[in-house]
Amino acid sequence: MTLLDTMVVVYARTPDSPFHQWAKEQIAGAVAGSGAAINAVTLAELCAEEGMEAAEVAHQIAGIGIEVFDVPASAAARCGEAYRNYRRQRKRESDKDSPKVPLPDFFIGAHAEIMGWELATNDPRRFQNYFSLKLVMP
């Protein structure tokens, strides 16, 4: 199974994106192979996009064969641990604070790691630094 980072789905729906073709190919390849998935965090991010109704987003996602999964409870502790490490490193390197609540990428990365899934992303920085998982990148 390939878990899709939110921006992979966004880029696949954005013809003028420099990652449009790559994103479409990743989704199509995953759907035809072991499966393509997003989680509830990604679904929320997609539904937050201006002008997008939740029913329309769900219809589009299902229409191209992407499965939607809840984030497993077992990923919560891993998400928190990775985000805590990120906050410490950010504070140490830049003396800047981060929000106390984990950013969406940490839920997505923890989910992929816990499930043993690969993760398709065009922005590997946080995933490489805080998780042990296979990344699919342009």
Regions found by a protein language model. Name each.
Residues 1, 109-138:
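Acidic, PIN/NYN-like endoribonuclease modules and their adjacent C-terminal/linker elements
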Residues 1-38, 47-60:
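Short, well-structured N-terminal submotif of metal-dependent ribonuclease cores
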Residues 6, 40, 102-106:
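Conserved glycosyltransferase catalytic-site signature
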Residues 8, 42, 75, 108, ...:
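Alpha-helix capping/helix-boundary segments
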Residues 35, 65-67, 118, 134:
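Conserved beta-strand segments of alpha/beta enzyme cores
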Residues 53-57, 86-88, 136-138:
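Short, hinge-like loop/turn segments at secondary-structure boundaries
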Residues 62-64, 130-131:
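Short, structured coil segments at secondary-structure junctions
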Residues 67-122:
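Active-site neighborhoods of divalent-metal-dependent phosphate/nucleic-acid chemistry enzymes
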